[in-house]
Amino acid sequence: MPESSIGAGCLVAVGVGPGDPELLTLKGVRLLRQADVVITPRGDRSDSSIALSIVESHIDPARQQVLSRVFPMRQPAEQMAAAWREIADEIAGLVHEGKRVVFVTLGDPMFYSTYLYLEEELRSRYPEVPVSTVPGISSVYAAAGKAHLPLGIADDILSVVPSTLPDDRLQAALDLPGTVVLLKVYRSFERVRSLLQQRGLAQRAIFVRRLGLEGEKVIPDLSKVASEDLDYLSLILVRREVHNY
């Protein structure tokens, strides 16, 4: 049976989707409203949290505590691990006080999420802390819908690949039939575009950025993607085969 409320002294990770507040799940909204503490991640170079902006209309600041915590992603591994440990310590302390804690994260908590580092810390050092997750709509699905591009039909293969991989591994993924989704293209766009052009796939590729947020763009021609279009929240969809049904 699905839980009807958050029990005292637990952590729930809520996926808030790609950016559009209307893509929040009903369950996510309900559990958000029941939380004593809402924790939102932000980057080390940002003063704001996109995840918080998505859910803030469902939070009551007079009743709920909102904590914004930095999740460093481009610092030395030791510094990043120290930050995750510190946040895990804080959450464990809140849970031990009987607080109902909700951690909000973009997309889905189990899909390339900042939350995963935190959960690993909690499970290894605080196994007594009850942890659960509420799925969110991934940017992959939202982008496919926005671009009207099917991710899989019949026996198609769907590959989801970080574009930060070395060239040989990216090339292997691009040689697979079906659809390839390239994530994290912000800092590797030119390299990815070149690989797609070499394989004659650039015209089958669609660039999508900032879904559901200000500055959203869907660009079906990679040659028209300019440097100012690149954003941390961007991906590329590549469909190798077209079915006629």
Tell what function each PLM region has.
Residues 88, 164-167, 189:
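Structural motif corresponding to alpha-helix initiation and N-cap regions
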Residues 40, 67-70, 133, 153, ...:
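Structural signal for conserved beta-strand scaffold positions within catalytic alpha/beta enzyme cores
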Residues 11, 174-245:
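A contiguous loop/helix-start segment that scaffolds small-molecule binding in enzyme catalytic cores
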Residues 83-93, 149-162, 224-235:
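A polyampholytic, Gly/Pro-enriched intrinsically disordered region
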Residues 1-21, 26-28, 33-130, 193, ...:
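Class I S-adenosyl-L-methionine
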Residues 107, 111-176, 227, 240-242:
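Class I SAM-dependent methyltransferase SAM-binding "motif I" and its flanking Rossmann-like core
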Residues 47, 51, 139, 188:
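Short phosphate-engaging motifs
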Residues 2, 27-29, 92, 148, ...:
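A generic local secondary-structure boundary/capping motif
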